[in-house]
Amino acid sequence: HNNPYVTEFNRVVTEDYSLIKPDYTFHDLVSEVTGFTNMHTTQPTYSYYDHTAWLNAHHDPRRWCAYIFYLNDTWLTQWGGQLCLLNQDEITIKDSIEPFGNRLVIMDVSDLTGTRINKHFISPVSITADHPRYSLAGWFYQTETDGPSPVRNENAN
């Protein structure tokens, strides 16, 4: 993509991004927030949800942490496109997160308890939306050689 926002976000995710702590990376931030210390990531994917577009309810297999950064300059609730997190019954909605611009969502999708958590979906974008829903999404995961689960720092926030 030639979008400067996408280019800058890719730099932030893969390189140093702090002027105060030049060695503090996005990976360090996610590790600090989630408590997972041995995760890996790839470059984020750019998503474009046009009118009536949506994403089925799903889990993120072999992934431990997911993040979404919203790129919308403006977004109204009635336009849809919310990230919806399901309860353990995987039917009722536990939480709905608006895709407001400059919002970063980091969510645990790990399997440390033996059951998948945070099954989620994207609600349909309304035909009344002024523009598509734009976001960058990525995952922290573990390779097969890393062992059965990520290491969680019990002192994490």
What are these regions (language model features)?
Residues 1-33:
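Non-heme Fe(II)/2-oxoglutarate
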Residues 3, 39-43, 54, 105, ...:
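A structural signal for the main folded, soluble domain(s) of proteins
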Residues 48-56:
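Beta-rich nucleic-acid/ligand-interaction surfaces
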Residues 32-38, 56-61, 75:
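Short, conserved, surface-exposed binding loops centered on an aromatic residue
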Residues 21, 25, 41, 62, ...:
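Short, well-structured alpha-helical interface segments that form or flank functional binding sites
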